[in-house]
Amino acid sequence: MAKFQPKVQSEGQDDGLREKMIAVNRVTKVVKGGRILGFAALTVVGDGDGRVGMGKGKSKEVPAAVQKAMEEARRNMVKVSLKNGTIHHNVTGHHGAAVVMMAPAPKGTGIIAGGPMRAVFEVMGITDIVAKSHGSSNPYNMVRATFDALTNSTTPAEVAAKRGKTVEDLFAA
């Protein structure tokens, strides 16, 4: 197993994706004979151009759990449209008791966000954003709420298509 791991990690670096580990938890399974220790990892992967994915992995050892999480994150990537390194409009996401609010920011603002949200923004290529989390600070729920908000964001072209108008008509009023 140990000989195989460096090869897998080098393959992951060849595809040009950015990887960030958000959390590693030690978990315990209680059985008749005692306790079985393991590890659970939460990671995000992004291409720096709007594609981002989240993955969870569990294993008896930390590196194996992280590797499983990275592979799952690569499989579960979603595309979010960005505008000059930020999002198009204010958006809110919910998951469980976690609520995240995001707002676009002008160039030079940077990433103003805490904890797990910052990692998601960094790997997906957002350079300027203001984000705030309320409620639960559980990293799993915060990342899911962030993904909920990002997937619910729309471009002006999508809004215009839904309304049967042109983009110019939307901003004319």
UniProtKB/Swiss-Prot annotation:
The protein's matches in PROSITE patterns, at most eight in alphabetical order, are given as: RIBOSOMAL_S5, S5_DSRBD
One GO BP annotation is: translation
Q: Name one GO molecular function term.
A: rRNA binding
On whether RNA-binding is a keyword of this UniProt record, the answer is: yes
Q: Does the keyword tRNA processing apply?
A: no
- Which UniProt keywords are listed? Ribonucleoprotein, Ribosomal protein, RNA-binding, rRNA-binding
What are the record's GO terms for cellular component? small ribosomal subunit
The residues covered by the S5 DRBM domain are 17-80
In the record, the note on similarity to other proteins reads: Belongs to the universal ribosomal protein uS5 family.
Q: Can you quote the domain comment?
A: The N-terminal domain interacts with the head of the 30S subunit; the C-terminal domain interacts with the body and contacts protein S4. The interaction surface between S4 and S5 is involved in control of translational fidelity.
Assembly and binders: Part of the 30S ribosomal subunit. Contacts proteins S4 and S8.
What the protein does comes down to:
With S4 and S12 plays an important role in translational accuracy.
Q: Which HAMAP family does the record match to this protein?
A: Ribosomal_uS5_B
The name under which this protein is listed is: Small ribosomal subunit protein uS5
Q: Which organism is it from?
A: Acidovorax ebreus (strain TPSY)
